[in-house]
Regions:
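N-terminal nicking endonuclease/strand-transfer module with a His-rich metal-binding environment
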Residues: 1-268
């Protein structure tokens, strides 16, 4: 019997520590952490060296020292044009119809596991360095973190470089308008691939127009960010109050010093 389920694909925040479970968030079941599947967990800086060190050497040949690139990782990290890496999250169904620990949830795990096996082969210009299937939250889902790059670049800069637009273009995705970017096209394509895999397990993609269901993890992270902002604002207010108090104390001390000087002058 065929079951209908939604398929979600969205850009994640890229919290590598969260994905590795270096800390346990509120929405994570500690008793299920051992069920998570780690497909890849590589050091981001080391992967940057692997991908770009030779290109950096070629670029630096004949360049003045002040124009040479000494650390491409830091150049991208401090720059504004590209991100160090991107994350995409995929999920089938939701907590009501594909909850972890249920028969349907286990089926979702099998589908996601099958889907991710050919991800790197299918997307050679998106170098995956971190990939996890989480089964310790409300619904099974995949976190795939990758570095988009292009080789044999003929434009300005290094011949091998970070570029989401060019990496996706080389995979055949040409952006249209702001609602039809290369990234949106690619995510929709990957959802279709996931849907084909799901079909083999008796799951039909239930499409709900352009409105996609948000992942539980996304809602949690959004809540956490709001909480962090509120805490920072409170800390700012506290520091501002401290600063004002210190300023008043300094002014008072200066006045006392001036009074002492005046008294000393009078006694003379």
């Amino acid at each position: 019997m065929t079951m209908k389920r939604t398929i979600s694909g969205m850009i994640g925040t890229g919290s590598l520590a969260h994905n590795r479970r270096d800390f346990i968030a509120e929405n994570v079941d500690p008793d299920r952490v051992q069920l998570n599947i780690c497909y890849r967990n590589e050091n981001l800086k080391e992967v940057y060296k692997e991908l770009f060190d030779e290109a950096v050497e070629r670029y630096n040949v004949g360049k003045r020292k002040d124009r040479q690139i000494t650390n491409y990782y830091e150049k991208i990290r401090q720059g504004k044009q590209e991100k160090l890496f991107h994350e995409v999250i995929f999920q089938i169904g939701n907590r009501e119809d594909m909850a972890v620990g249920t028969e349907a949830g286990d089926l979702a795990v099998n589908v996601l596991d099958e889907y991710v096996k050919d991800f790197q082969k299918r997307n050679p210009t998106l170098r995956v360095f971190s990939c996890y299937l989480h089964q310790d939250e409300a619904t099974p889902h995949l976190h795939i973190d990758f570095i988009p790059y292009v080789t044999d670049w003929k434009g300005k800069g290094m011949d091998t470089r970070v570029s989401l637009k060019q990496a996706l273009k080389s995979l055949g995705f040409q952006g249209g308008n702001k609602h039809d970017t290369e990234l949106n096209q690619w995510i929709n394509h990957e959802k279709e691939v996931l849907a084909e895999t799901a079909k083999q397990y008796g799951i039909e993609w239930e499409q709900k127009g352009t409105h996609e269901e948000h992942l539980d993890v996304y809602n949690f992270k959004k809540k956490e960010r709001k909480k962090e902002v509120q805490e920072l604002e409170q800390e700012k207010e506290h520091l501002t109050a401290e600063k004002e108090e210190l300023t008043a104390q300094i002014a008072e001390s200066r006045a006392d010093i001036q009074n002492l000087k005046d008294c000393k002058s009078c006694s003379c």
